[in-house]
């Protein structure tokens, strides 16, 4: 496939796939060699401002001298916009190489009578391949559905996985990982701290209130 054909294939995925479980995402990552374990992930969730927050975090890390990947959605013009390395959108060749690896895996899974990765899973898997091959130190990842429903959750190296959310309601949606840090802040009239503590009681991570 060339670049245009690859994009057309991805855009057509929702027509022939259904939502998969998180176990499916983990299995795909494993069969790709667990590329997500080659860097640290900052997983950003919340109602509004996720993309801006991801960009801010990436800029700060770049100023500190780190190599960074950025994964956001949706794209505005071209699908490549979802993937940035050191604040630069990836080129078509990089996109196509990652697609070919994920497409090969997808074909193998279908041939085995298993599942085909969803639209978002396909892009997420491509992103992990792209960032691993680029050798980045950090990846700032904007959540998709988020929480227990999102394929971008619970697949990361927990020793370096930080989560930022607009209030601990994000934590209560099961985004926070055992062994990781969670950064949150209060807003509105609900007792977000109490909610965060209730959820965090079952986790081994630290809750830092700002």
Question: How would you describe each model-predicted region?
Answer:
Residues 1, 20-23, 52, 90-93, ...:
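Conserved active-site and cofactor/substrate-binding residues in soluble primary-metabolism enzymes
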Residues 40, 69, 138-139, 169-171, ...:
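Structural motif
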